[in-house]
Regions:
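Membrane-proximal linker segments that couple transmembrane helices to downstream signaling/catalytic modules
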Residues: 223-345, 357-360, 367-374
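Alpha-helical transmembrane segments of multi-pass integral membrane proteins
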Residues: 34-54, 108-109, 134-197, 207-216
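Alpha-helical transmembrane segments and their immediate juxtamembrane interface regions
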Residues: 86-107, 213-239
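Hydrophobic alpha-helical transmembrane segments and immediately flanking/interface helices
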Residues: 70-90, 199-223
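N-terminal low-complexity or simple alpha-helical regulatory segments
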Residues: 1-117, 131-134, 138
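Alpha-helical transmembrane segments and their membrane-interface junctions
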Residues: 57-71, 188-206
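The DNA-contacting recognition helix of HTH DNA-binding domains
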Residues: 300, 350-352
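Juxtamembrane or sensor-core-proximal signal-transducing alpha helices
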Residues: 152-165, 196-202, 216-241
Length: 374
């Protein structure tokens, strides 16, 4: 391989990573206490990116790949091990502000130190040949397993938050954090890929460098975009966590009620909900299950249990279904209304969100339905 191709690849990636890393560390955020967790997450990401930039710098300025391939591979694996932890911690912190603890931090740092020591032993003490190569692949396998373990933990936190949003919010707040799921799967593919691509022959190693460019650009843009919605998401998350804690406190009463074939509160609840539906109370934007429980003068936990038992769906899906049916009636009665008007009157966040949900529910777009009504 011509060293220039490899060098040009590093010239493309290194400045971008330095810019992203320092931006994540130093760029300001709104001066509100609620953004402290976002800033912490972004700074963790900045440290991870700068650590990878330092790795790239060693490759660029020292040309270690051409001097000692095994040393370059083991250095990469050790760097990735620490970065896996940093990336997963940065993302998980957005979902659980209490995720990073002293004990957890100490454990993962010790694991990284152990991994690095073993890498040094493999490089310096084991003879070159089949044994050294086998142990290097074993270390790479350990890295992949470690990454998958962190990924599983992150996805569990993500799905827990989505479930809380669906059970407590009528609006699709989860759409604002969907990028976390997308980025996680991309990170798994990229992380495992990097662990394998570092073993590529010299003539193809530039692929390892260039593959990182779109990955970090996407991460950078996601964090910039998420800043716009972070306060709304964090408030919803805090409300949802509080509601979940209330659920735990009310578990005994709920279990006692659910032992009956028809819980004692269902008949009264059904009457109250019917009156609320007849009054079109579900079209109010930003509706939460707590607000509905206050309107119905009932317990939030009982209301949530009633919705799940009676309709076999989450609070958000139930409200969405009611809003879609309301939108259908508007389309039939007032075909001259625009899609944007119908979306707003039905309580949806945006016309695009309304169109997507309408198509999922009705099997056609509201525009087609509107044309048919006309």
């Amino acid at each position: 391989m011509e060293p220039s191709i490899y060098s040009y690849s590093l010239c493309i990636a290194l400045p971008l990573m330095l810019f992203f890393g320092f931006y994540f560390l130093l760029a300001p955020t709104p001066e509100k206490a609620i953004f402290n967790n976002y800033l912490r997450s972004r700074r963790i990401m900045g440290v991870a990116i700068l650590l990878l930039a330092a790795n790239y710098s060693v490759h660029f300025f020292l040309g270690i790949r051409f001097k000692n391939t095994d040393a370059a591979i083991l250095m990469n694996l050790s760097t990735y091990f620490l970065c896996y932890w940093l990336f997963s911690s940065g993302l998980t912190t957005l979902l659980d502000r209490f995720y990073i603890t002293k004990c957890r931090l100490r454990t993962h740092i010790c694991l990284w130190i152990l991994f690095s020591i073993l890498s040094g032993i493999v490089l310096l003490l084991l003879p070159k040949g089949g044994l050294q190569t086998t142990v290097m692949f074993a270390l790479a396998a350990w890295l992949v397993i470690y990454g998958l373990f962190l990924t599983r933990r992150l996805l569990r936190a993500y799905h827990r938050v989505i479930r809380i949003f669906d059970d407590t919010r009528a609006d699709d707040i989860g759409a604002y954090i969907k990028w976390l799921s997308i980025f996680t799967y991309w990170a798994v593919t990229f992380g495992v890929g990097c662990g394998l691509l570092t073993f590529l022959p010299d003539e193809y190693i530039y692929i390892w460098i260039l593959s990182s460019v779109p990955f970090y650009i996407y991460l950078f843009l996601c964090y910039l975009n998420y800043l716009l919605f972070y306060e709304q998401v964090e408030n919803a998350m805090e409300d949802g966590m509080t509601s979940e804690e209330e659920d735990l406190c009310d578990t005994t009463n709920r279990e006692q009620a659910q032992r009956q074939d028809t819980p004692f509160f269902h008949a009264e609840m059904a009457k109250k909900i019917k009156g609320w539906i007849d009054a079109d109370g579900y079209i109010r934007p930003g509706l939460t299950i707590k607000e509905l429980s206050d309107v119905l003068h009932t317990n939030r936990t009982y209301l949530s249990g009633y919705i799940k038992t009676t309709y076999d769906m989450s609070f958000r899906d139930w409200i969405t279904g009611l809003r879609i049916e309301y939108a259908k009636r508007l389309l039939a009665r007032y075909p001259r209304l625009t899609i944007a008007d119908i979306s707003e009157k039905s309580g949806f966040l945006s016309p695009s969100h309304f169109i997507r949900l309408f198509k999922e529910n009705a099997g056609c777009t509201p525009k087609w339905r509107k044309t048919e009504a006309e």
